[in-house]
């Protein structure tokens, strides 16, 4: 049993503690003040010190404001902060070719020296002619690792050095109403007899040779077993008003169309040399879309000079090209206008690299059929040279190319010979071919064969400068409607 004295002393001690306000335990807040570690930055004395990078951000995680306090410059703070948050993106030296790297949040930026560009300073890829035609509207030529743009006759180069601006009311190569519509086609036309021919290109000079119509007085008979000596549009669709403004039609003394042509200028029409054997005398009609109905746009012109290529080979149709100079100028209007002549290199690298060209004419609508009374047009794909040569039983020279389909029943045919093959580039149409020959019309596995105009651009330009030979200089006297015939030896 407890001693009564002890109990009295214990009670007195407890009473004393209560009266003094002391406690064995301390409050939670007081305990936290004792146990918690005081942060350096929150210390009264520390706040009075200038920011220190090691103290602020290396020993502990810091905020952007604390880093800014250290650097006292926002740009330097950003450079530090980008590395501090997600590491240095420039550590691996991603900028090539002496480029300078600048780190960012989850990214980096390269400042490149001249001649390099891109995210990592790759060598500059010049926008030369092979890439989007160098940005040129029309002709593109590469010079000193840059491009030089130029334009066809009747256009001027814009201030940006790229665009071509028309300087004429009716510029070449423009369709002023409607649009070309695609139509399947198989190109083939009249077939020449079997005989080899030279494969060569030409830019020869012009010299006066034959008397007027000497050649035309003795037309060469069509090759044996040839379904035509002219060429046509099989399939295709009607040319709407203004869609084929460069189409010309050669008409004989009976006012019947027998060959086509391409308007080059107000005085000049391009056609096939073999067409000169189809009539003793002929005129040129333009603006005609329906041979049975007058629409008020038609014009008929007498021919003053015929410039036939002197190397034309009747047996193979090689060098199948001629230029006609008219006695009176063509009146251009919305549905009568020239096609553009291209530059040689550009024509071969750009125009003939397009998928398709356009052929038009009044030829037969099927092999051995009747001539069309309405002007037809047909879109035909270019055919690679190997396929072209394999498809033909005859020689395909360097002055020829193929176009058309090998299985679709569409092609140029008898009556279309000499007519235009044009290629569209950025809404301007350029002369790329002359309808020349084919094995039948739209036969399976056969294509239409065209004179390759790019081989004769210099020759065409010289021919367009030719003038009529005075009667006294001619070996004979031409009739009132007989043109002077010139040749063009190489």
UniProtKB/Swiss-Prot annotation:
Q: Give me the gene this protein comes from.
A: F10
User: List-wise, which residues carry 4-carboxyglutamate?
Assistant: 46-47, 54, 56, 59-60, 65-66, 69, 72, 75, 79
Q: Which InterPro entries match?
A: Coagulation_fac-like_Gla_dom (IPR017857), EGF-like_Ca-bd_dom (IPR001881), EGF-like_dom (IPR000742), EGF-type_Asp/Asn_hydroxyl_site (IPR000152), EGF_Ca-bd_CS (IPR018097), GLA-like_dom_SF (IPR035972), GLA_domain (IPR000294), Pept_S1A_FX (IPR012224)
Origin organism is: Oryctolagus cuniculus (Rabbit)
Q: Which UniProt keywords apply?
A: Blood coagulation, Calcium, Cleavage on pair of basic residues, Disulfide bond, EGF-like domain, Gamma-carboxyglutamic acid, Glycoprotein, Hemostasis, Hydrolase, Hydroxylation, Protease, Repeat, Secreted, Serine protease, Signal, Zymogen
Q: Write the lineage as a comma-separated list.
A: Eukaryota, Metazoa, Chordata, Craniata, Vertebrata
What family does this chain come from, according to its entry?
Answer: Belongs to the peptidase S1 family.
Gene Ontology terms, MF aspect: calcium ion binding; serine-type endopeptidase activity
Q: State what protein this is by name.
A: Coagulation factor X
The answer to whether UniProt assigns keyword Protease to this entry is: yes
Q: Which SMART domains match?
A: EGF (SM00181), EGF_CA (SM00179), GLA (SM00069), Tryp_SPc (SM00020)
